[in-house]
Structure formats: structure tokens, C-alpha cells
């Protein structure tokens, strides 16, 4: 919400216009024995100065964006190659089609990171910015929904007990993610050479919709999965959602959903911050949450690799040799 600037200095005319309280002027009588009340003009000017925040993700952060993009593309491409490699043991991972789509989502996110990076030029149009935010949040929404699906269906994915998962459910999840990106796509533009969301009264409904979508998917979805897991365990109703290393993904986006909601409340004046320091802390948290979300494109392939390694290490030795290469693709194909 602003560059790292010193507080604005007021002009001499502004300094001279600092006046007494109206009540003091009303009660003031011109008498030689009376004296003017003492006023701390420096404190008044300090309070009147605008509040500026230091933006961490400015032009100097361009190497971070580029490095995250390159590493994310390389790592995700490697995971995709191993998942689709013929006769490779990762094809025995439970729900490997969902895992492949997670890698695709991470790759798409990595590709658009440079589009939204600062410091790449000052002649950006609104079209690349809108497309960048669409893919940015669309891939993140899709990954979150796929993780929720993977956790809910659990080991059933590996047994081929859900025939329509590969096509029908995947199309539905990606379609829902695309629809959820419409608000931020329509409410983003290039400003001063930077791709940024537009905050205006006319677009307040779009901003509210986007904030609610982020809060629901990045915050409420993982909390719901944890709650369902604990509730079913307490009531003895079954194992509940399938917990695994992939749930770490939500750590990278959970702060973004929370801080984005707080920022919207402040902009809408539903939540008033008492001091300039509080506003600066909120802006800092917004930058840190965005940086953490960017790091997910590098962490996601590593989480997928670790999950597949753990799953196949315990699964492959227990299968006879001919059954080791009967992947879930064959099982789903035989049922269709």
C-alpha cells in the first residue's frame, strides 16, 4: 500500500495553518494577562503526516520471483515426467492422476510468477495482468480443491473404486477454480508498471467475492478437513479424511487467506486500525504471505515426490511382480 518513504513534510503554508482548538478560540478573550496555551506543533504535524509502508516485494525482489519460477518449473516438470514415465513405480501411488494435476497446477503457477513480478518494465497492459492473476489464483484454487478431494476419497483412489474420478471430478474441480478467479481477473490492472488488484468502490463486490473465495478455500477448507478428521475419530465413525504429507501445502496459502480477509475489512472500514504502526504491520504481513504463497510452487513438487516415495516404498514390495505394473490407469480403463 505504498513505497518505503519518509513521512511527508508539510509546506510552510501548512505549518502556519496549524491552529488552536475551536473551543479554545471561542473562550479566548483578548486580555493582556491572558497567555496563549502551549501547543506541541511538532506532535500535531507528526500525527497529520500520511502513513506509508515499506513494500518488501518491490523491484529489488525480482531475483526472488525469477528464482522461484525457474525452480518451480524444473521441479514440477521432473515430477510430471516421473509420474507419466512408463512402468515407473510412482504410477502405483494412490490417486496418481490427482497428483499429476497438482504438479500441473504448480507448473502453471510457476510460469505466471514472472508476469506479476515487479521490475520487469513499466509498459504493461491490463491483459497480461488479468491473465496472470487468473492463472495465479486459478491454479492455487484447483490445487486446494484437488487436495481436499484426495484427502476425502483417500485410499479408494488407489483401489479404483471411483470410476468417474479421472475425468468428471477433475473437470468439475478445474471448472470451479476457473469460475472463482473471475472476480480477481476483472478487478486487476497495471498501475505504475505493476500488476495489482484494483481497489475502488465500483469493484467492491468483486473484491468481496474474491476475498470470500480465498478465505473459504485457503482457510476454511483445511480447517474443515482437520475438524472432520478429529470429529470422526472422537465419535468412532471411521478414519475420516486421509492425512498425509500433502496437507503441508495449506501452510503456504493459509496466511494469505487470513491476511487478505483482514486487509479487506480494513479497506472497507469495517475494522479500524488504531495507529499507523498497525497499518504498516498489516502491509508487512500481506507481503510476507504473498512471498510464502509464491514459495509453494517449489515446495509442491517436493511434497509430491516425498508422498510418492513413501507410498510406493510400502506398496511395491507387498505386490507380486506382475501386479506391480498394473497401475490405477489400467484399473480405471477396465471399468470404463
From Swiss-Prot:
Entry annotated with the keyword Membrane: yes
Glycosylated sites: 16, 27, 33
Record GO terms (molecular function): C-C chemokine binding; G protein-coupled receptor activity
Residues on Cytoplasmic side: 85-95, 154-166, 229-244, 309-336
Record-linked Gene3D superfamilies: Rhodopsin 7-helix transmembrane proteins (1.20.1070.10)
Places the protein is found: Early endosome; Recycling endosome; Membrane
Membrane topology summary: Multi-pass membrane protein
Source superkingdom: Eukaryota
InterPro entries the UniProt entry points to: Duffy_chemokine_rcpt
Keyword Acetylation: no
GO CC, one annotated term: recycling endosome
Signal peptide start and end residues: none
Primary localization: other
Transmembrane segments: 64-84, 96-116, 130-153, 167-187, 208-228, 245-265, 288-308
Function: Atypical chemokine receptor that controls chemokine levels and localization via high-affinity chemokine binding that is uncoupled from classic ligand-driven signal transduction cascades, resulting instead in chemokine sequestration, degradation, or transcytosis. Also known as interceptor (internalizing receptor) or chemokine-scavenging receptor or chemokine decoy receptor. Has a promiscuous chemokine-binding profile, interacting with inflammatory chemokines of both the CXC and the CC subfamilies but not with homeostatic chemokines.
Name the record gives this protein: Atypical chemokine receptor 1
Lineage of source species: Eukaryota, Metazoa, Chordata, Craniata, Vertebrata
Amino acid at each position: 500500500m505504498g513505497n518505503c518513504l519518509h513521512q511527508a513534510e508539510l509546506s510552510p503554508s501548512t505549518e502556519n495553518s496549524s491552529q488552536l482548538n475551536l473551543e479554545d478560540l471561542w473562550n479566548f478573550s483578548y486580555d493582556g494577562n491572558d497567555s496563549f496555551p502551549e501547543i506541541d506543533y511538532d506532535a500535531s504535524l507528526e500525527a497529520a503526516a500520511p502513513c506509508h509502508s515499506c513494500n518488501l516485494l518491490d523491484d529489488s525482489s525480482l531475483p526472488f520471483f525469477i528464482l522461484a519460477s525457474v525452480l518451480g518449473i524444473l521441479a514440477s516438470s521432473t515430477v510430471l515426467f516421473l509420474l507419466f514415465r512408463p512402468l515407473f513405480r510412482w504410477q502405483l501411488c494412490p490417486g496418481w492422476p490427482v497428483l499429476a494435476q497438482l504438479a500441473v497446477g504448480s507448473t502453471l503457477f510457476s510460469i505466471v510468477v514472472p508476469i506479476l513480478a515487479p521490475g520487469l518494465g513499466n509498459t504493461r497492459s491490463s491483459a497480461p495482468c488479468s491473465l496472470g492473476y487468473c492463472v495465479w489464483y486459478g491454479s492455487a484454487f484447483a490445487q486446494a480443491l484437488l487436495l481436499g478431494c484426495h484427502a476425502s476419497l483417500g485410499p479408494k483412489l488407489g483401489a479404483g473404486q471411483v470410476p468417474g474420478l479421472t475425468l468428471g471430478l477433475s473437470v468439475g474441480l478445474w471448472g470451479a477454480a476457473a469460475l472463482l478467479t473471475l472476480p480477481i481477473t476483472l478487478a486487476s490492472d497495471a498501475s505504475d508498471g505493476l500488476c495489482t488488484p484494483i481497489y475502488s468502490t465500483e469493484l467492491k463486490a468483486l473484491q468481496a467475492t474474491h476475498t470470500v473465495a480465498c478465505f473459504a478455500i485457503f482457510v476454511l477448507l483445511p480447517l474443515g478437513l482437520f475438524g472432520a478428521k478429529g470429529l470422526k475419530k472422537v465419535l468412532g465413525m471411521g478414519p475420516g479424511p486421509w492425512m498425509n504429507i500433502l496437507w503441508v501445502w495449506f501452510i503456504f496459502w493459509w496466511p494469505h487467506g487470513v491476511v487478505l480477509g483482514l486487509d479487506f475489512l480494513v479497506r472497507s472500514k469495517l475494522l479500524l486500525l488504531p495507529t499507523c504502526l498497525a497499518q504498516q504491520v498489516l502491509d508487512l504481513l500481506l507481503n510476507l504471505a504473498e512471498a510464502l504463497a509464491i514459495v509453494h510452487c517449489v515446495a509442491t513438487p517436493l511434497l509430491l515426490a516425498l508422498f510418492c516415495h513413501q507410498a510406493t516404498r510400502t506398496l511395491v514390495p507387498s505386490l507380486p511382480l506382475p501386479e506391480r505394473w498394473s497401475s490405477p490407469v489400467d484399473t480405471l480403463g477396465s471399468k470404463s
